[in-house]
């Protein structure tokens, strides 16, 4: 059952795309280690090799979000810029994310039968890093088919945020939702257009079986 179903298309577009921000990276890195203070899980565990990689990532991420707007042609005064092709820039971030994933994996194995709480947190943080790396690779290479890519300055600090979204969500929802679930109920006062559901049905990929009740 989906309430406020008139928002499904926009919500799906947001969740099926990419959003990478400096603050998102910083929040994740801070949970691992803040180099200046030594705070974070890796500081608590005294995990030297992984901590060194995180320290390098702090600098590399800062460089990345300075370079991406330049490579995309987003001027300081611009609020948004569509990215129409893969970006020609060099960044250490993708390689460092892969390096960190390996080091966190090794650390998880080292802690076996010792500290399950820390191991669980490490697995969670490692998964976030893998997801961030996958989204960054996809954005820089524009490897997601039928997506639009853009950079947008957000917040009081006007930090550049990397976005992508599928051009149409209907094929994705048709395969992942309506084609898999026997019954889907969409409730909203504004689904029908002129008393008919064709427009909503086509936009969401609900198929001809969609009925108005």
Descriptions of predicted regions:
Residues 1-213:
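ASCE RecA-like P-loop NTPase motor cores
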